[in-house]
Amino acid sequence: SSSRYYVFDSREVATIYPGLARRFDAYDFDIIHSQTQFSLGVLAHWVAKRQNIPHVTTIHTLYTELIDDYPLAVLSGLLALSVAFPVALKSQPVLPRVHRETIKHLNKRDMKTALSRQGWRLTAAFANKCDACLSPSQHLARILIDDGGLTTPCMVLPNGLDSTRYRSARAADSPIPKAPGEKIIICVARLSPEKRQMTLVEAMPHLSGLPVKLVLVGPGPSQEELGRRAEELGVADRVILTGKCSPEEVAVLLKQADVFSLASYHFDNQPMVFLEAAACGLPIVYCDERMTECLTERNAILTDGIEGEDFARVFASLLSDDARLAALSEGALEVAQQFDSETMTRRLINLYEDLLVSYH
């Protein structure tokens, strides 16, 4: 069963209860791999313990960076996990490390830091009950170790991509008209505050002298707000909100575009869309200095700041230089080859095999 959880816009969250793990006794599992550290992660822990099999968990994203957008929800979630984890995992309590004398002097920034650290300590506490932990990026692994106290072996395993769909996609199949000489900036992501598409919309007035469109691909709660902001800024005719698209449609839109951009900051880890963009030969413009996987000087540009005008400066320079665009596009295709899904799958299978040997 499931219930509504208000942190992420009332998404469905699995409901677990004591005794649920027994229902899986009929299945002859060799290994358990959880992709979340919340209710289903706890269920995975219970099943692995009952069946005496290895438990691997993947930590996908920087959950605590949602504090700015969902402060009360994240705070309540941290409090709930601080109480629930010691009971569900039979572990020591994970208490916040804030000295009582400093609490009354905490400002907003200090409070966010304390909450973030507590979030990573809880995440690491879960991972420390597993046999292995996977992180898609080096910087996330370092946060887990330094801020969370992770001691379980952690493998950095970047996302892999089967590029077949992107190689076969044709720009000519796009429903979006593109005039000769016109350039397209594209962002593929859920339309929500943490993805910061508003920053890209606010870059567009600074590009009024260039024939350029911004295509925002994906559904989400911010769609209407983004449309209104484009109207206010007088760029609605150059900002296209596609809504939800199929994977095949996304591939076509990426093939048609000239630049991929993502404005999320200290939230994402190793977004799959970076790999998809690289597979289509798209240069990437981003602002989060902590993201490194799939981002090199050969295919990506890090902005000097995180605001719309910072992105606009990079866009204006890049879109006016066809030679640089071509060089970055070639570099993107080369980078994408390093993240072949078969290579990443083999590394994961090797980990599974090593764990199974250690259990028998």
Which residues does each predicted region cover?
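Nucleotide-activated donor-binding/catalytic signature segment of Leloir-type glycosyltransferases, i.e.
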Residues: 227-245
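Conserved acidic donor-binding segment of nucleotide-sugar-dependent glycosyltransferases
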Residues: 288, 297-309, 317-323, 337
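Conserved donor-binding/catalytic core segment of Leloir-type glycosyltransferases
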Residues: 177-204, 215
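Acidic anion/phosphate-binding donor-loop and adjacent secondary structure
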Residues: 145, 161-176, 349, 359
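Carbohydrate-associated surface elements
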Residues: 139, 160
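Short alpha-helical donor nucleotide-sugar binding micro-motif in glycosyltransferases
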Residues: 244-245, 252-257, 348
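Short hydrophobic beta-strand element within catalytic cores of glycosyltransferases
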Residues: 274, 279, 283-286
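Acidic donor-binding loop of glycosyltransferase active sites
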Residues: 131, 255-269, 282
